[in-house]
């Protein structure tokens, strides 16, 4: 089957793409997200997606698509700031890269932050949770992207190293 992407333009360079090979909708062509881990507490921050986004009311990373000429690192840091108000330094460790048959890419990063904080959420989020590793594995419902990340051996190795 030929891969066909359909685009819906939302203005200001924002568009959604549709991959007919999988039936999936993606926001842009390249996107990324971060799974933040607090260095001191070893707990992990998850985003509960709002009812206004794809895969609503599922737990996932904070993230989104590249804007303009951004690189993936700058995009992930910007999205983390926009979605939860985090203005301090975050170290990003590359993890799993999801690639759809139609060409969409989602770059997952594990983030290291010094302290837990109370996120100031935007409209894309309905809530958040700070979790230990076992709670992360058992929380439901998970976004399909989070499920894939947690099945990836490299990503799990990075997480385990940081929480040990």
Describe every region a protein language model picked out.
Residues 43-44:
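Entry beta-strands of beta-propeller and related beta-repeat scaffolds
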Residues 50-52, 78-79:
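Recognition helices and adjacent regulatory flanks at domain boundaries
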Residues 8-33:
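Acidic, metal-coordinating catalytic segment for phosphate/diphosphate chemistry
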């Amino acid at each position: 089957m030929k891969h066909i992407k359909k685009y819906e333009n939302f203005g200001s360079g924002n568009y959604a793409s549709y991959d007919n090979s999988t039936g999936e909708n993606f926001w842009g062509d390249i996107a990324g997200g971060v799974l933040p881990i607090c260095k001191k507490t070893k707990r992990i921050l998850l985003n509960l997606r709002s009812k206004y986004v794809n895969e609503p009311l599922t737990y996932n990373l904070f993230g989104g698509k590249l804007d303009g000429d951004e690189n993936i690192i700058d995009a992930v840091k910007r999205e983390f700031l926009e979605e939860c108000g985090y203005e301090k330094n975050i170290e990003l460790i590359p993890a799993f890269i999801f690639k759809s048959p139609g060409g969409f890419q989602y770059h997952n990063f594990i983030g290291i932050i010094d302290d837990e904080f109370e996120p100031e959420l935007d409209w894309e989020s309905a809530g958040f949770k700070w979790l230990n590793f076992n709670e992360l594995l058992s929380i439901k419902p998970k976004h399909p992207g989070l499920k894939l990340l947690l099945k990836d051996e490299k990503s799990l190795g990075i997480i385990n190293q940081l929480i040990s």
